[in-house]
Amino acid sequence: MLKKFVLGGMTALVLAACGGEGGSASSSAPAQSANASGSLIERINNKGTITVGTEGTYAPFTYHDKDGKLTGYDVEVTRAVAEKLGVKVEFKETQWDSMMAGLKAGRFDVVANQVGLTSPERQATFDKSEPYSWSGAVLVARNDSNIKSIDDIKGVKTAQSLTSNYGEKAKAAGAELVPVDGLAQSLTLIEQKRADATLNDELAVLDYLKKNPNAGVKIV
C-alpha cells in the first residue's frame, strides 16, 4: 500500500531573497519577493545568462539521458524560462547538500531541483517562483522489511541527504541518519543492507522503481 506523507512539495524555482538569512526552495520561475525578483531579472538580463544549480542525478526532475544530455522536468522548465527571458541558460551540477549554500553565496541565480521550502529558516532566506508541480513524500524499505510507516523508523538507519526536507523529517521521527549524496545512493544502501529505509519524493522513487524493477525495495 503506497502511503504518502504531508511532507509533499510544490515544485518551483528558488532564488536567494534580498537581505534575508534563512531558506526555502522549489523549482520554477522567481516570484515571491517583488524586490528580489526584480533585481534578479535585471541581473540576469545584464549578464545575458541565467545560472542554475541542479543535481543532474535526480530523475525525473534533473538527470542525464542515454546520450549524456542534461534533461528532466525541472531542467526543461528552466530552459523554457530562459527562452522566455531571451537569455542563455548555464547549469551548474552540484550535490544537494551544497546546493542552497551555493545559492546563498551567489554561485547560482536560481536552483531547479524539486526543492521544497518548508522550514522557517529556508522561507526566511530564499524566495521561490510560482509552483508548477506537486508531489508527495513516500517511505521506502527493502522488500522483506517489517517497516510499515514512518512511526517505525525510530532508531532505524535511514539514508538521507542531511540538509533536505526529507532528512529533517526522518530525524524528527527519531531515525539514525546515514548521509548520502542523493536518492540513488540511498536506495543502493538499502539494497546492500547498509541502511534500512529512506524518505523521498514519490515521483522520483516511482521513476527509479520503473527503471529498476528488480531493485529489491518497495514503497511501504
Regions found by a protein language model. Name each.
Residues 14-17:
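C-terminal motif of bacterial Sec signal peptides marking the signal peptidase cleavage site
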Residues 125-133, 178, 214-220:
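Short beta-strand->loop
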Residues 91-101, 162-164, 178-192:
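Short helix-initiation/N-cap motifs at beta->coil->alpha
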Residues 115-123, 169-172, 196-220:
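A ligand-binding cleft/hinge motif common to bilobed small-molecule-binding domains
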Residues 19-22:
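Bacterial signal peptide processing site
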